[in-house]
Amino acid sequence: KSIMKKLKIEIDYDFCQLDELSEQDLNLIESAKAAVKNSYANYSHFHVGAALRLHDGRVVIGANQENAAFPSGLCAERSAIFAAQSHYPEQAIDALAIVAHNEKGFLSDPITPCGACRQVMLEMEDRYKQNVRVLLYGTSGVYILKSVKDLLPFAFVDENMRK
């Protein structure tokens, strides 16, 4: 008879204020904040902006786009990633910043991506064999994660289908 083992998953992440960020990371968050203006969120009134920095330093933005048939919309993160992959498929993503704004303004707590976006973000790490730093903005501060895997600990990637 085997004995069940109790296992634990922990992640390390940083929490900082905007004035503690590098100029490059601050600019990425500011680009994501500017992208919120391109959001079409007539139904939820929840506007999300994303900005990603490619390996060559180029920044690509995305904003959520809602549709009356809710599954037909697209989140800001995937909007930015798919735009980057369509225009610059040879460029890995080094970092991704996400911000959100409701009817009261930017959220106090850092915004986190939905499960579908986490999976697409993870695919970029797997595709280019490098981590994507994730910056999650709130007016109270910024969470910084070293890898998308920190958001998706039981990750499903191509390798899982080959074992």
Residue ranges of predicted features:
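C-terminal binding/interaction regions
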Residues: 3-38, 82, 88-163
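A short mixed-secondary-structure module that forms the rim of ligand-binding clefts
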Residues: 67-86
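A short glycine/serine-rich beta->alpha loop
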Residues: 63-70, 103-107
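Short beta-strand scaffold segments in enzyme catalytic cores
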Residues: 47-54
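Short loop/turn motifs at secondary-structure junctions and domain boundaries
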Residues: 41-44
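Short, surface-exposed loop/turn motifs that are enriched in glycine and acidic residues
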Residues: 18-22, 66-71
